[in-house]
From Swiss-Prot:
GO terms for cellular component: myosin II complex. Trimethylation of Lys-116 observed in other calmodulins is absent here. PROSITE patterns: EF_HAND_1, EF_HAND_2. Coiled coil: none annotated. This is Calmodulin. GO terms for molecular function: calcium ion binding. Belongs to the calmodulin family. The gene is CMD1. Ca(2+) 4 binds at residues 130, 132, 134, 136, 141. Keywords: Acetylation, Calcium, Metal-binding, Repeat. It comes from Pleurotus cornucopiae. The modification N-acetylalanine is found at residue 2. The keyword Metal-binding applies. This protein has four functional calcium-binding sites. PANTHER family: CALMODULIN LIKE 3 (PTHR23048:SF0), MYOSIN LIGHT CHAIN 1, 3 (PTHR23048).
Amino acid sequence: MADQLSEEQISEFKEAFSLFDKDGDGTITTKELGTVMRSLGQNPTEAELQDMINEVDADGNGTIDFPEFLTMMARKMRDTDSEEEIKEAFKVFDKDGNGYISAAELRHVMTNLGEKLTDNEVDEMIREADIDGDGQINYEEFVKMMLSK
């Protein structure tokens, strides 16, 4: 399944993996998964975190290594994000709930994820998704961006 991913996708997933793998040991633990989920405004229980790990933990060692992570991401991409997941993700970014993601909101979430972006990088991300050119991302633009990945 992971062999259907492009090199670019694999390198993006490697970057995402290292955001989760806080101590850089090559595996994601329930603790690390919890940290990232909480930084995204989610509040999973220990049991939910364990379930998430168990779903992709092919060798049953209780952690996720990069090949397992790739399999999970490939599976997720195949099940293309449901409308509900996209709505939830939009809410995470749209901090003030006004229906738009501003550059400041985007920067805030990315910083919480451990991604230190320059103003130019944030502006570039907004520009790429901002179809109507108003300088922010509305829900329709967000959906298009999520489905075009």
